[in-house]
């Protein structure tokens, strides 16, 4: 999937995101401004296939986006619920590294790995934090 095809797909499903569509649009605009590779770290993964209006699908959205960017772009996600990780792995591509466990420990270890590898995180997303993005 190239960037044009990503936006064709995203524009088709955007209405299913409800009020979150504006935030995801802003996120992807921001990511478009960054050089490859795009590295996204997420806490709390997709939990139910097709649940765009609820708490999920960010993992799928980020998966499709990073696939469209290519060049080593990747998503790292962690969830403490093994069932959620199982469902997530059934929906997303191998471009998403899924980890079962406590996010604090996972993020600490991932940070150490990224320091050694000199990997820069493009975007951090957590379903546990609610924030307001200024939409202009």
Cite the ranges covered by each PLM segment.
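A short alpha-helical cap/connector motif
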Residues: 1-136
